[in-house]
Amino acid sequence: MFVSRLAASGLLLLALLALSLDGKPVQEKPGRSPPISPLLVPPPPPPPHWPPPHHIPPLSVQKFPPGWKPTHPHHIPPLEVQQWSQGGPRSELVQPHESPAGGTTAFREELSLGPEAASGPAAPQRLPKRKGASATSAASRSMRDLRADGKQARQKWGRMVQPDHHAAPGGGGGGGGGARRLKGLAKKAVGKGCFGLPLDRIGSMSGMGC
């Protein structure tokens, strides 16, 4: 009730104020207002002075007179076409589906022999079977000698690395004086230490990493 009365009185005061201001003329301020200068628009800049473009001559097609020839012509040899004789014998040529004289076996033998199968004075002379057998036996004998030397070198290396292992008496089946083969638990124990990689068949172990 009290609030409504306050609101009504406020609205009445606002209405009276509007009526009092409506009848009064607009009061001008004393003094003159400063003059407003006109808007100045700058003139446009002059166009840029570009240099004249280079003279490009028109495209002309080179024309030669009817009977003109170059002073230094390049020599081009004429094209040679390989001509085959019409109806000539072709018995010396081997077709892909044919085999040479002697059958497929002879052809395979020539391929396997390589340059030895060539005929003529440039072909190497074939050795007789006896000489070939002797050469093969000599080659196999030299390979056995090299294999034995390698085995002896490995045995010497094993003695140098593990002198205690090779100092015990008793043969090991080709150990060369004192080498013995480790068996059972002793062999497993040695295999766990120093990498334990066997070097040959007599049971010698490598001493790398000790």
Swiss-Prot record:
* Pfam families (UniProt xref): ANP
Q: Which domain of life is it from?
A: Eukaryota
Which residues lie in Gly residues bias regions? 169-179
Q: In which tissues is it expressed?
A: Expressed by the venom gland.
Q: Spell out the residue ranges making up region: Disordered.
A: 25-181
Q: Does the keyword Signal apply?
A: yes
Provide ranges: composition bias, Basic and acidic residues: 142-152
- Cellular compartments per GO CC: extracellular region
Instruction: Tell me the first and last residues of the signal peptide.
Output: 1-23
Note the SS bond partners.
C194-C210
Where is this chain compositionally biased, Pro residues type?
A: 32-56
Keywords of the record: Cleavage on pair of basic residues, Disulfide bond, Hypotensive agent, Metalloenzyme inhibitor, Metalloprotease inhibitor, Protease inhibitor, Pyrrolidone carboxylic acid, Secreted, Signal, Toxin, Vasoactive, Vasodilator
Relate the protein's function as given in its record.
Bradykinin-potentiating peptide both inhibits the activity of the angiotensin-converting enzyme (ACE) and enhances the action of bradykinin by inhibiting the peptidases that inactivate it. It acts as an indirect hypotensive agent. Tg1 does not show bradykinin-potentiating effects.
Instruction: Name the PANTHER family on file.
Output: C-TYPE NATRIURETIC PEPTIDE
Q: What is this protein called?
A: Bradykinin-potentiating and C-type natriuretic peptides
Q: Which organism is it from?
A: Craspedocephalus gramineus (Bamboo pit viper)
